[in-house]
């Protein structure tokens, strides 16, 4: 009942109005899986390749007809007749057929869409929700947890058209007793933040991930206005709500220095920028910092881990790009203590699960993440619960492409009840 009988690829539109790949996998029992590949703005140089057409007459060169053709042609032919329940085999067939180190032949967007669609179809054929099927693929059947959300309520960097250098300022509703309550707290703080910004005459337009994108005097001011909003919403900063940041520092790393254009082009060495961040953690209850230095600055990261690694969570995104080879090297060298998991960075579900397992086995945390270019596909919600990852980053409290994931988590929590505990701050490394 779970043999693949048909695979369809198509070009659809993501949350930024750019094309992406959607795949449909049909099984002989009439079961169907549908999945779409997300797309990033600030991307690590070692990510698997997102194949774009480059034809300037269509979608400004961003079309994905080549990737779609790969789905409908060689990929479909290779997986027809194969058992969708054998995820590792499906993914291996596609990866081997592609034959490149970074999936540049077919595109990680093509391979991932089929990989996820096959998993969804297999779950349907087993008569179980996707998160349950993922837990079985993960070798942890029946082991679930609800993730602590990191909600990106102020967007800067590559995610917004403003003068804020640091890409994401996030809140974590750690005082919540459930995922549903965490979403409510996040929503209330988000709405109070709008009032705080308006009172200061600041813009409340939103960025790619649904957070506000005002022009601010400094990066520290972003933390200050969030602190004000938390208080206005009736919560205590540090107790009910903690803070997190994604620096995406590779985006402002120029000629060996970290240059904050929004702060008068202040330039920092790796050590100086580490202490700049350390000062912020002393002023505000920041418990997690992602990509605090450039992806290639491993010596700097070793220093940053030494200074901050026993106090807070240091997440590698561009640093590790969900790649087990790079993560293994990072673990051996004691770089960071957490990995961001974006399945389109590596391009298949099997490899994503391997990265999560490697991180957990080494005592690193794993934070499941969206991309800035998303669709209504909410697979990452099931991935977070099915791997009991403990943390999720899926944007702010606006834009359906973000909220779709929170709504799916609410449904899953309702279905699982006490089988999926919400552990809050305990999930964060160093807390």
Curated annotation (Swiss-Prot):
Pfam families: Enolase_C (PF00113), Enolase_N (PF03952). The keyword Cytoplasm applies. Its cofactor is Mg(2+). It is an enzyme of class 4 (lyase). PROSITE patterns: ENOLASE. Pathway: Carbohydrate degradation; glycolysis; pyruvate from D-glyceraldehyde 3-phosphate: step 4/5. Catalyzes the reversible conversion of 2-phosphoglycerate (2-PG) into phosphoenolpyruvate (PEP). It is essential for the degradation of carbohydrates via glycolysis. This is Enolase. It comes from Serratia proteamaculans (strain 568).
